[in-house]
From Swiss-Prot:
Gene that encodes the chain: fliW
HAMAP family in the cross-refs: FliW
Name of the protein this chain belongs to: Flagellar assembly factor FliW
Function of the molecule: Acts as an anti-CsrA protein, binds CsrA and prevents it from repressing translation of its target genes, one of which is flagellin. Binds to flagellin and participates in the assembly of the flagellum.
Pfam families membership: FliW
InterPro entries for this protein: Flagellar_assembly_factor_FliW, Flagellar_assmbl_FliW_dom_sf
Assembly behavior: Interacts with translational regulator CsrA and flagellin(s).
Location(s), subcellular: Cytoplasm
Amino acid sequence: MSVTIHTKPFGTIQVDSKQILKFPQGLLGFEEFDEYALIEESAESPFKWLQSTKESGLAFIVIQPELFMNQYKPAISDEELHDIGLTSWKDGIIFLIVTIPHDNPKGMTANLQGPIILNGKEGKGKQCISRDENHSIRKNIIESMEEMSSEKV
């Protein structure tokens, strides 16, 4: 079954109802919006959009951490994830919110401190706070990709 969503980046689109995720507590700062669609702009892009189903202007660019850094492990207690049906963050899919400066796209950063954990089986998600003090809210993605590729050589 498809659902119609109005978005600013893509206009009015149809998404499969399986792409709709419930966030029981919303996202930090946007608690009143508890339903989002995970939209893939293109198969080649490492980025996806987390688009509110209720507010066309509310969308976040997200990325999975393993695409630009090694061994990201959020410091989250297992109890924090029980309300979305997970016993550990390792059982979920992790996304990080990306910020892209208008004047410097190469300066794009990911928020390591506020990971979004998804339970794909139940269609639920939650934004948590990682208590690891080394997790920056502005981890440079391009620099991290370059570091990761130089480690493989």
